[in-house]
């Protein structure tokens, strides 16, 4: 069997607690595999252990530090050790990049598979929401959460998807089918961002794909509409309170926190929990009503309409596209326990398929100053096999640009034996 690692918000039947990175769940052993873990075991996978994560999948504080949890401390980025591994599937990304395993499970609500995969220089795939069961996984959102594979190669992600969907090799088989020469890809130019290295690598990727016969259309701008980001954040806070309370009610009696309210009180009393950042998101989520609220329904309708009918679906129809493409993210930032993440915005469009619930893959796109960059392909709902196959086509065209980690203490390190590239 192939050894794999599982993010510490996904339940496994063995003697490992599922903590979400919090001491409040240190006794969360429920003697059950989440359905995706059961399917992986049935296909011969060996669960090697759990990976650290951004605590509560990075949904506790607006000033959080990615890759830090009270239970396991700080995950490092193996390429440059004082740089963020991103999150929230931080440990899964770092472990795969380090070669501890060839595959791990991550989860994503908005960016939590794609960002750590990009910043650790590996492949990450976020499936269409609902394709994989979310049962027995600590939740944030009923409309955006999904588990997904984080792997060294695109084929690795296809193998994992075959196992988790019981698709009998159809994801892997689909890789060998030639993508038609008529394939047209929409370049989300508004998501290029300003990083020189990312843009250089992105332009090279376009040329490599053009050489293989792919056609491109530039999409200069797209606007999700007024009030979008406020509504998107609000939806998550509504859903978090509801889904977390439901989840906690299914845990064993040794888990003393039975609600978000209990959790807030636990954190106030346990100095290990709040020593680096606060629980501002918990507090504002607790104040909200349940999912029958008109405010919630209106906000959800707004964001789904923006990202689906007026977003990915509209763009693909309007320009007659097969896929959308953009850089995945800017290169990673410094780990900072004083001020939290300083994520460089402007690069990447992963929030669009995340909120829409549509498939998205990131594939290594080379490095800039020893830091990995990634290329994203996105598609319509249910286009999972095709999106993975497109990622594979790029991986083959580029000759696989995954770089082994160099474990540099910092980018600024200039010592004999360290070669700092441009």
Q: Which residues make up each language-model segment?
A:
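Glycine/threonine-rich flexible loop motifs
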Residues: 18-26, 195-196, 333-342
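Acyltransferase
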Residues: 34, 197-222, 243-253, 260-267, ...
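Glycine-rich, small-residue loops and helix-cap segments
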Residues: 7, 42, 164, 283-422
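A short helix-breaking turn/cap at a secondary-structure junction
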Residues: 123-205, 223-226, 269, 398-422
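Short helix-loop capping/hinge segments that flank enzyme active sites or metal/cofactor-binding pockets
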Residues: 1-20, 182-188, 238-307, 362-372, ...
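Structural recognition of the beta-strand scaffold that forms the well-ordered cores
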Residues: 3-6, 39, 46-50, 102-106, ...
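Short, well-ordered beta-strand elements within core beta-sheets of diverse protein domains
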Residues: 5, 24-28, 145-152, 378
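Gly/Ser-rich catalytic/binding loops embedded in alpha/beta enzyme cores
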Residues: 1-110, 128, 316
